[in-house]
Amino acid sequence: MTYTVSIDVAAPAELYDTFHAALLKHTGGHVDGLLAHVAWPTAASFRIIEVWTSKELRDRASRDIIPQVWATLTATAPGPFDAMPVEHVEELDTCGLIIPSADLAV
């Protein structure tokens, strides 16, 4: 079983790029339970699709990792960083997932 979410964030894609780089530095690219993460800019924001092994691990990352990275970013990066942007999260029913390079098929 997997847990999939679509996340819309009303912030510029440049903010995503900066945060994503900080997140990779913090985690080394590994977050427990995260199977796939894809992001792209929209007209006024950015959207993310994530597939997790469980809702609990996604909730833990949102509670523990994301705020730590945001706090580090706001303390060290140049630029105007205010409060962390609000995420609008929609849970999706995943019908299937195949990641050949990870030998994963659900």
Question: Each PLM stretch: what is its role?
Answer:
Residues 1-71, 75-106:
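Short S/T/G/P-rich N-terminal loop/turn motif that feeds into the first structured element of a domain
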